Structure formats: C-alpha cells, structure tokens
A protein has these predicted regions:
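Structural preference for long, well-ordered alpha-helical segments in enzyme cores
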Residues: 68, 81-88, 119, 152, ...
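Catalytic-core regions built around general acid/base machinery
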Residues: 119-125, 151-159, 213-217
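Short, basic/aromatic recognition patches
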Residues: 2-33
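Short acidic-capped amphipathic helix/loop micro-motif used as an active-site/signal-coupling element
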Residues: 53-58, 82-86, 167, 249
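A short, well-structured catalytic beta-strand-centered motif of the EAL phosphodiesterase domain
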Residues: 28-66, 184-186
Length: 285
C-alpha cells in the first residue's frame, strides 16, 4: 500500500485560506458567452466560478475545487454557484434577454447521494426560470449514471430543466441516448473536431458517424452542438464548414466578472454589469 504523507505547511496554509474564503462566501462569477456561428450573436452564457482569498488573490477552479472536494464542501459550492446563476438569469429575463445561463456541476457533487435531488427543490423555488438555467455535467458523469442519478435527472427533465454534456475527452456519443437523458446541448473540443475533419473519412466517433455529420445528427434529436475552447481565429471557418451552430472560446471573448449586486456576491473590484456585456462581448468577437 502507498504510504500516507502528511501535508506540507504550504498545503495546510492553502487549505486554511481556501476554507476561510469559502466560509466567507467570497465566490465570484464570471460569464463567458457562447455565440452563434457564423454571426457571433450571444445565445448563452456559461457561469464560471472564482474564489477570492482574503488578500485579494483570485483563484480559478483548478486551484480551489480539489481542496473543497477534499473537505466535503463541493456540493455546497455547486449549490451556491447555482443560486448566483439563478440571480443572473433573473436579471437577464428582466432585461428582455433570451440568453440562458449554463452552470457547471462538479463530478464530485454529482456522485454525492441526494445532490441531484436537492437541485430539483432549489429550482422549484423559481419556476419563472425553468428553461433559463442549463445544468452542465461532464462526459464522464453522463457515462457513469446509476439508477438514482437517472431518476433524479428524469425529475429535473420533467420540470423543463435542460442539460448539457461538457468536459468531453473524446468524440464518441450516441445522439438518441443523449436525447433520452434530456441533454439539449453538447460541448465538444474544437481541436478534436478539427483534427477528425482532417482525417480521410472523419470517422472519429464510430463507424456510422462522420464528424461532418455531428451537428445534423444531434440537431435531429433536439441537441445543439457547441464547439468549446475556440481560441484561434483560423478554427472558426473550419467549424463553420462543419456546420457547428454554436461556439465558445477566447477568440470571441474570455470570461468577464459580473457585478456583485447582480449575482448576490460580496463586493469585488472592477466588475462589469450585464448591461455592458453585449457591447463588450461583441466587440471582443
């Protein structure tokens, strides 16, 4: 058996700082747009969480999520992010925007017994937002659903909550099976799709499905394809040629902070408001 090592003083300090920031509710949301192709009109915002330490340092998920997971706080974190995202969605609705908000759920939380059921109760408190919040789950989680997960997802689906598959590591999927689960958006890495398109027959996802047919095969099942991590300009025309309807990445706009009063956050320095977002994001695109 591998030996257990004691955490270093630096690791203990980082855990303490992250825990303090979380308990002080210093979670901040940034929004990154998902745009239509080829016209780059904003259709969707993905809510991306950050955690601000007491000294002002802003941490990305890769820096704090493993620590929250290790301390059993991941599901509480996801619920807080969802509540903030619901506030953002309500703000968008009040402004007459048709954009929806995607909320990432961690694999750790999804695996926790009762977590998905708790989301149904949370979303039931705001029936006016049904259809405006998309729950995003990683590919790995979708591939390892147990009976309880499926039952909870069925309840959410019946309430009109759309789902998205993201954090894909390959291009293999069954459009019919995804639709049966209630998935309405599917995020695939732009570089993997482009790499597959450069092959002789494009048959990356299986013997019957060519990457050039991804968008149409998904559309027939009511699923919209999103190319993610579109970070280079020369990717865009290739994705357009593949018929990809939606895309996300730094070539259009990076994540930008939301005003704290919109998301119900503690005050943070130099945020921008959703009323500014369309201008800023379209300029970036």
């Amino acid at each position: 058996l591998p030996s257990m090592r004691n955490p270093s003083a630096e690791e203990v300090s980082r855990m303490r700082l992250v825990t303090q920031a979380f308990e002080a509710d210093r979670i901040e949301l940034h929004l990154q747009p998902v745009v239509s192709l080829p016209h780059t009109k904003i259709r969707f915002y993905e809510a991306l969480a950050r955690l601000r330490l007491a000294d002002g340092t802003l941490l990305g998920p890769g820096e704090f999520l493993p620590l929250l997971e290790a301390s059993g706080r991941a599901s509480d974190f996801d619920r807080r992010v969802l509540i903030r995202s619901m506030a953002i969605a309500r703000h968008l609705v009040a402004r007459g925007s048709e954009a929806i908000v995607g909320v990432n759920l961690t694999a750790h939380s999804i695996a926790e017994p009762g977590f998905l059921w708790s989301l149904a109760g949370l979303l039931d408190t705001s029936p006016d937002l049904l259809g405006k919040i998309v729950l995003e789950m990683p590919q790995h989680s979708w591939r390892h659903l147990d009976a309880d997960h499926r039952a909870a997802l069925a309840i959410l689906r019946e309430r009109g909550v759309p789902f998205s598959l993201d954090r894909a590591t390959d291009l293999r999927f069954d459009p019919v099976a995804l639709a049966d689960l209630g998935i309405r958006f599917m995020k695939l890495p732009a570089d993997l799709m482009i790499e597959a398109a450069e092959q002789a027959d494009g048959r990356y996802a299986g013997p019957e499905l060519d990457v050039r047919d991804f968008a149409s095969a998904l559309r027939r099942q009511g699923i919209r394809l999103i190319a993610e991590r579109v970070d280079e300009g020369d990717m865009v025309p290739v994705l357009c040629d593949l018929g990809v309807p939606l895309a996300q990445g730094f070539v259009f706009a990076g994540p930008r902070p939301v005003k704290p009063e919109v998301a119900g956050e503690p005050m943070a320095p130099q945020p921008f408001g959703l009323e500014d977002a369309p201008t800023l994001l379209r300029r970036a695109g």
